[in-house]
């Protein structure tokens, strides 16, 4: 069995990943590593061994690597993998991993939105937080997981008129058809976050 260290995995991943909007050959890569014994039998929260993403590029280049942690987000990631995945080797995710109970999936959604309470919690990452809330709203309502642009379009049809321009702007910026200026829309963003969180909390209760 080949054993690879976090530095080896993350530095190798950097070579085939590029920051969002870079326009290069590679797309932004996200990688999550779990040990099957830590997620089967399923428990909440489960342990994540390693995670790679472009938001960690600076830390990785400086030699800082996240340790293994208990991560509520694995309930969402494994649900997504079981719904939409392609196995490159071995059995499918739907047979390799156990289903995540609905109550744990809902708790993971609730625990995720709990981190966004004040402007400082999303400052500099406004677009991603707005789109993440759209995905969570969609998932809380349907039990399914959709791409950010699909979830944003779905949510825009259910928003009061005053919040639609922001979600449409975030979606367009994500798709690359418009510039991302959400950092300049401080009050709009805060109002959307408050409204989306309150709506999601009502659905999950």
Please annotate each region the language model reported.
Residues 1-15:
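An N-terminal structural lobe/cap that precedes and organizes the functional/catalytic core
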Residues 11-121:
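Conserved NTP/Mg2+-binding pocket subregion across the NTase superfamily
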Residues 36, 138, 201:
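Residue-level marker of positions within ordered structural domains that often coincide
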Residues 105-169:
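Extended, basic/helix-rich recognition subdomains
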Residues 144-205:
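Structured mid-to-C-terminal alpha-helical surface segments
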């Amino acid at each position: 069995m080949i054993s690879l260290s976090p530095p080896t995995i993350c530095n190798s991943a950097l070579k085939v990943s590029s920051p969002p909007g870079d326009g290069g050959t590679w797309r932004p890569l996200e990688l999550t590593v779990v040990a099957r014994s830590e997620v089967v039998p399923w428990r909440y929260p489960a342990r994540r061994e390693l995670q790679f993403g472009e938001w960690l590029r600076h830390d990785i280049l400086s030699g800082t690597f996240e340790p293994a942690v208990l991560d509520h987000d694995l309930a969402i990631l494994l649900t997504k993998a079981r719904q939409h995945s392609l196995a490159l080797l071995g059995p499918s995710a739907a047979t390799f991993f156990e289903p995540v109970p609905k109550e744990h999936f809902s708790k993971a959604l609730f625990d995720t939105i709990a981190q966004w309470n004040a402007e400082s919690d999303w400052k500099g990452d406004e677009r991603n937080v707005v789109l993440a809330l759209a995905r969570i709203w969609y998932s809380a309502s349907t039990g399914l997981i959709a791409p950010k642009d699909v979830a944003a379009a779905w949510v825009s049809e259910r928003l009061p008129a005053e919040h639609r321009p922001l979600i449409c702007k975030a979606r367009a910026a994500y798709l690359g058809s418009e510039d991302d200026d959400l950092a300049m829309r401080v009050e709009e963003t805060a109002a959307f976050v408050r409204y989306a969180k309150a709506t999601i909390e009502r659905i999950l209760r």
